[in-house]
Amino acid sequence: MSEMNPLLLLDNGSMMSVLNEGEFRCKNLTFEEAKHILEIHDEADILRCFNSQDIENVIFNYLGVEKRNFTYKHIRNMRVGQDAIVFKLYITPSETQPIIHADDGVEAKKIQNVYVYCQYLTRLA
């Protein structure tokens, strides 16, 4: 792993933790840009700073990134010059609650909508 500045993968909570000190630049990423950034980094040069299976599903199943086992590490401060991809989940109650019936008769109801977007974060100073 690059001892200087591994790429950090953050979620809503871990992003708030690393923003406690310094100057940062943040920009929105398309899913294609996020996938490209992940693919150009070696597995050993990426740290996963969250424990969310939902976000891992976004990375590997939705973005289509090859399954890798990124090392987990709790990070409190980003280093100057360090970059991160932030996966922001936004959950809202469902305005409609359609009911579906499975083949075996089980009933399920939609209760929420889940949205995700990506940001690229760099610590400047």
Per-segment meaning from a language model:
Residues 44-96:
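Acidic, low-complexity, intrinsically disordered interaction modules
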Residues 77-125:
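Polybasic, proline/glycine-rich intrinsically disordered low-complexity segments
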Residues 23-31, 39, 48, 52, ...:
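Intrinsic-disorder-associated interaction segments
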Residues 2-44:
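N-terminal low-complexity, intrinsically disordered segments
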